Amino acid sequence: MITDIASYLRFFDSVRRRTERDVAALPPGAAAWRAPAVDGKPGWSIGQIVGHIGGSRLYFASAYRDEGWIWSEPESDPAEQATWLPWLQASAARFAEQLRDTPEAWLARRIEMIDTPGQALSGWRLLMMMLEHEVHHRSQIDAYAGLEGWPVPDIFGRSAESIDALQTDQRLKHARRA
């Protein structure tokens, strides 16, 4: 459970930095990339996903502030990669500003869901939904990048292989069998 906004915003800052890092790592060809159509419906481009991440931050902030589940149009051009990072940065700053001075009691108050009248969730859960949503779409971008053979940054600056290489020492240090 999230118990104070300052702690939440510090965690959000770490999540948004990783999103920006991964988007910044995309090659110039990423702007032209398109997901394959499914059932005749075109998939979103990476630029559309980036725009959606930024807009969704403000959507969740609006709901948390009891201003309605209001969607903000992305202030980026899906076809212009140069607009992606500025939009992510601007939406992150606006999100943090909209939450920074909200009362701590709002973390526990109930917020009615947009599509299920009578169903509500606590403020802290809504804020965690925003983070899960962002990580979901960042992972989507990273999966597409990997499938295209583009570089995908390690999530915490560590690869699975680098951790595997340390396992023998860890097992010895902690006296566990392999």
Mark where each language-model region is:
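Short, contiguous alpha-helical
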Residues: 9, 13-20, 30-75, 113-178
